[in-house]
Amino acid sequence: MITKNYIAKGEGANRFEKIPVQIYETADEAVKAVAREIVDLVQTKAASSEKCVLGLATGVSPIKLYQELVRMHREEGVSFRNVVTFNLDEYLPMPKESEQSYHYFMHHHLFDHIDIDPKNIHIPDGTLEGDEIDKFCRNYEKAIEAAGGIDLQILGIGRTGHIGFNEPGSFITSQTRKVFLNDLTIKDAIKDFGSRNLVPTKAITMGVGTIMQARRVILMAWGEKKAPIIKATVEGRVSDSVPATFLQMHSNVQFVIDESAASELTRADYPWLVSKVDWDDKLIRKAVIRLCQKLKKPILKIEDKDYQDNGLSDLIEKFGSANKVNIAVFNDMQHTISGWPGGKPNADDSTRPERANPYPKRVLIFSPHPDDDVISMGGTEARLVEQGHEVHAVYQTSGNIAVFDDYLYEMMDIADLFAQNMGVSGEGYKQVKETIRNLKPEGSEPKVVLKYKTALRAAEALAACRFMGIPSERVHFLNLPFYETGSVKKNLLGKEDIDIIVNLLREVKPHQIYAAGDLADPHGTHSVCLDAIMQAFDVVCEDDWFKDCYVWLYRGAWLEWEGEKVDMAVPVSPSELSIKRQAIYRHGSQNNGPAYPGDDPREFWQRAEDRNRNTADLYNKLGMAEYEAMEVFVRYMHGK
């Protein structure tokens, strides 16, 4: 469990938190603890010849939990024969055989791999219509009651604060019923369905009252996207506008979350307001930045009284005066700024983020999709090339499912016309167009369509690299197998994926590596791609070249690094920002509305420029030089 930088009085016991919270560094660690509690309960019940009644959730959060339970069944011989399950919810309408159904989800991730009795499995029926739905809901409540009630209810949480599909406005006494889904919930489901118009707008869900009757409740949440709603639920007032806050009234509830999901809790965000903290350089920087933002003052204008009035007297005691704190933090921030991301050759690098030598460096820039590098660090990428380094662009996945069918059709028209003008056969292009015309709105895309979409995105990446001066022989398309399913649902990361990255690393032997640390979605492609790189590092970490390799994590497509975390800030001039924009433009299939925009409807170049300008503005308001924009990076230290 994470306890660094603060000394908690107990498991989440502080004046801000109204629900017990257990924080783990990673979801992997957290699910092991939850799985052990479930298994202990199952086995205790079995020893008394009793049934164990579990309420189960779907969605991203419980996937790793179910994987751990399956592992315990296979490797430790844990039996689930005495388990009765009731699932929280199901979309309406939803055929059971659909990959998007929770019936399919539960069997795919859990039930097909353990020894549970099929007659003990209960999942809401998404095929029902009209009065059948109400009758089913009444019978579902009766079935839970007949089973003796739920012993342990597992929950996730939606960004609206929904538990199950109990959206804002749900009553604490509500029972199993048909509901209409919130707009944000529908947006979050697009990644599972492929497009908004395929996401159902209704569902069957257990009620808040049904959940509250469970004897024990564990809510799990992973990733930064969940941080705001976790804070609102744990520290906010009870309100039907955030249904999860009703859990504050449950006598036996536990939130189990990872460090990212906990990042906005007061004990993580402002730990000095909770208890005595262990001040390190990053936490001191964070406290001073927050104070500057609150008071709208630059660092060097903060006074003793400002620290004393805002719970930061410890810093005065530690340093002796506000002036000494200010100078230390100002210098700390100033030293993150570098116009030489690859290191300035033959210069004193004692206060620079990157070492001067060797020069030039071999640089690997990993990009989860074929445009993430230019979106997130295009200015830095161009500068590395300009300053003479051997820059390699590495595209981990094809990104093929993010190409609209209409756009590919247009490209096939162009290719067909070229073929006609050159007097060669364009029959293949005509066949692709015919395939596109006959595509069904759901399901995996045909391989021939995916092949051309892959080629299209590769050509766009080559064009962007060519524009920035990266030769084609230094552009690497890995097409990692985990991604190549032809649908939004991906395979699990495997050894084949890791080996591909290991082989490239050992071939190039880079002095510098850049990788996407944009983990807004902890089970999205960015996270999986970073996990693949980290697992590859585990393999090569004893290689001589790796011991002298710096690893930098970038963001920018979805979120930006907070100022207190930044290790290197690269200024971007107006002309360099224009170069970055032009490189992004080369990815034509992603312009005029990306396939998976998330919450932000703007083009990627607009998002990136705003984030880069906001970062420069932060530095300027803290008292640093004024730049047009900045791209920022966090250094990753493997094994530390």
Regions found by a protein language model. Give the residues of each.
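Histidine-anchored nucleotide/phosphate-binding helix
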Residues: 65-76, 374-398, 402
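Short Gly/Thr/Asp-enriched flexible loops that form oxyanion-binding sites at enzyme active sites
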Residues: 65-72, 164-175, 523-539
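N-terminal active-site beta-alpha-beta segment that forms phosphate/nucleotide-binding
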Residues: 13-139, 143-146, 391
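Short, glycine-rich nucleotide/cofactor-binding loops
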Residues: 59, 365-374
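Structural motif
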Residues: 53, 84, 151-152, 216, ...
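Conserved phosphate- and dinucleotide-binding cores of soluble alpha/beta proteins
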Residues: 2, 6-8, 25, 29-30, ...
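Glycine-rich phosphate-binding loop signature in dinucleotide/nucleotide-binding domains
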Residues: 45-50, 145-149, 503-511, 516
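Metal-dependent de-N-acetylase/amidase catalytic core
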Residues: 186-194, 198-203, 296, 301-364, ...
